[in-house]
Structures are given as C-alpha cells and as structure tokens.
C-alpha cells in the first residue's frame, strides 16, 4: 500500500540521491585535475556513469511530480587533493559516499523499479570503489 508517507520518503530518497550524484560529479572534476594521466579514461568513464545515474534520477523525480534540485556551484571536498595519490583517495571516498547513499535509498523506497535502481547504484559504486582502493594498495 502506497501512502503519502511512502511518497514523501521515496521523494526524499530520490532528491538525496540526486544531490549525492551531483557532488560525485563535481568531485570527479577535482580527481580529473590531479589524476595520473594513465587514469584519464577511467576517470571520464566514472564521471559519465555518475552523470547517467543522476540524469536517470532526475527523470524518475520529475515523473513522480517532484522538482529535482539543481547542482550547486561547488561542493566541499573532504580533504586537500594535491597529487595523483590524493586524487585516487578522493575517488575512493566518492564511491564510498555514493554507496552509502544508495544503501539508504534501497531502504527508503517501496517499488521494485526503485529498489533495483538503488541496488544497481550500490553495486556500481562498490565496484568502482574497490578498483580505486586496489589502485591505492588498500584492501577493498
């Protein structure tokens, strides 16, 4: 049974996920600026994946009658990024933060479509994060 509380919770989950993806896209811009040149394609692919998920979330939000948030001009980076190592650390943090968002998303939505979307987002972020942690020599 879908109630108004359920709709508000799903709406909140969608809007939070959009914000998380907007922050990830911004942070990947910082990663790109400091990354090892050998990782340029990987960074571009990950950025594109976050854009695609954000765009899908915006469409889902709009279809639900919500007004999706626009991206902020800037987002706070959790630590200074000054070289390729700190850029990779930021990328790992981006994916960890995104995974946390999708974990909460799955708990807050009630439709199979949205749960599947959240599980896919969680899985994708976990895989990307494991790749970055592996590149850093830390255990996934």
Which role does the model predict for each range below?
Residues 1-140:
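All-alpha RGS (Regulator of G-protein Signaling) helical domain and cognate RGS-like helical scaffolds
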